Every structure is written in C-alpha cells, then in structure tokens.
Amino acid sequence: MSNWDDQLDLLIRARTPIIWIRSNEEERVETLLKNSTKRLSPRRLATWDYINGISNILNSNNLGSRQPMAVLEWIKKVDNSSPTILLLKDFHHFCEDPGILRMLKNLTITLRSKPHSIIISSGLWNPSNDLEEDLTILDLPLPIEAEIKTLLSNIAEASNSKLEENVLKELTSACSGLSEARIRKVAARALSQRGQIGKEDLIEVLEEKRQSIARSEVLEYCKTNKSPNDVGGLQILKDWLKQRKQAFSEEAKDFGLPLPKGVLLVGPQGTGKSLVAKAIANSWSMPLLRLDVGRLFAGLVGASEARTRETIQRAEAMAPCIL
C-alpha cells in the first residue's frame, strides 16, 4: 500500500466531508477508491455521473437521480449504519450553481457527524472562493514504479504473455510519466501486433510519451543526437558531466551519493545554452523536455496554476530527465 493510499484512508477515517482528488485518471481513481472501501470495510462505494445517476451500490443499482442536487440530498439521508464513500464524476461543472454550492457547504457541517465522505474527481477545476476552505485536496500522482511494474505484469499474465524480468524492468522505467490508461494503450497495441509485450515496445512507449507531453501544450519532448563533443569550450562543465554521470548508477545509489540537481547556464542568444542541454540529455541517456514558460502562464485565471502543477508532476514522474 502506498503513502497516497494511507493519506486517503486517513482522510476517510477522519470523516473528512468533501475530498477533491486532483486527477484526470477517472478509472484509476475509482479503482483506488474500491480498494480503499475493502480496507475500510464495512464502507461501500457509490458513484454518480450525469448520465447514469447513482450506481455501483451493492443490491441497489437503480437508486438516485441524474440530477446533481438529488444526489447530494441522497448522501445526506443515507443511514449511519451504511457508511458510504460517494464518488462524484464531472461534478465541478455544477459547482457554479448557487444552490449546489450552498448544499455542499451545508454538507461539510452535516457529514462531520456521519461516516460518509464525498469525493470529487477532477483534473482542472478552479473552486469558488466560497468553497475553497471547505475542500480537502488530495493530488493523485502518476503511477509510480511499483504500480507500473504490477500493471505490466498483470497485463502480461492475463494475456498469457511471458515477460522477462530484465525487459519488465526496462519497460517499467520507460513508462514512468505515463498515465495508467496510456500504459494500457501501449500494452494493448503490442498484444495486437505480436501477441506479447517485449523490448520492441520501448519505441512505442517513447512515442506515447511524446503524445502525452504534446497534449500539455507546455512541455515538448525533444529528440537529440548532440554530444559534449559538439560543444565548443566549457571543458570544466564537460568534465563535471562525465564525473556526475556516475551518480545515476546502482553503486552510487547504494552508497548514498546525491543526484545532481541542475546546471545554470547564463549568456546571450546563440552561445550554445540549448545545445548544452541537448548534449547533457544525450550524454546521460535521459529524456529532454522543453518547458515553454510563456504558454505556462498564458490563459485563464486558475488554468496556469493547474498547468504548472501538471507540468511539475509530469517531469517528476519522468525523472531522471533533463528539463
């Protein structure tokens, strides 16, 4: 169980009325909540969306209305003997309504004495100032190495595909920075083409990463074939790069050697700053991400904060990388 699972369980046990899980991975959020309800038995999970209404409740699949106000009335009346976690999908679209806003604020008080929690799942939402103090925010990071390894192993096992340990390790590392849905997409493509997942899929993973990063409109995945030999001068930097490359080895990790944090390059245009970044990425065999700061802070209020958060999260998930 991860630290994130521990945080979620703690918030639910503490009877936190409304939790906003910041994530675009709706299916993954629902799976994590299902696992949480198993750990926190006898709690049950109910989900709501505007098309299906309330569903996923044991023996009560047709309860509840499609209307957003009705589902809030429903959770308010659920008996304490049936502790419930209610996942509201796309609910942020309705939170500008004064009635919905008032009802949510009322529920933050009502649910403190009840064993129920409301979960709102959304990646991009700028909550009203009136609701800001009543929300508990829980950021869901992209899948970590252990989750990716388990996911790939399960997919291979389900398809009777043999996955060698060294190949699994390489694919796990390559898939860091991808959402669970995108990892499944790469695996499904591999199984359709060759009937198994293998080392050949590393190229597919890199292409999926490029598409994932391109979607952010802020990060760009850069290809590079430059090396330190293409850079004139800067011998001190080149020596440092050669020496510090060893910090990423297993021996250095076991020894406790800290990873290099960054390099500050200062100079006018045309002096090779971007070239050096490309050379570092190629020399250290790491992905190179280009961040467009102008786009990062352009657009609507609230959107730039969400983009910054997503950008940092994506870069951290792809670590080690050159940004």
Which residues make up each language-model segment?
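Short linear interaction motifs
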Residues: M1-W4, R66-A70, V167
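Surface-exposed beta-strand-to-loop junctions
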Residues: D9-R13, T84-L86, D130, N166
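Dynamic helix-loop-helix/coil hinge segments at AAA+ ATPase domain boundaries and subdomain interfaces
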Residues: M1-D9, R13-T16, R22, E220-K242, ...
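Conserved AAA+ ATPase small/helical "lid" subdomain
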Residues: I148, A156-R210
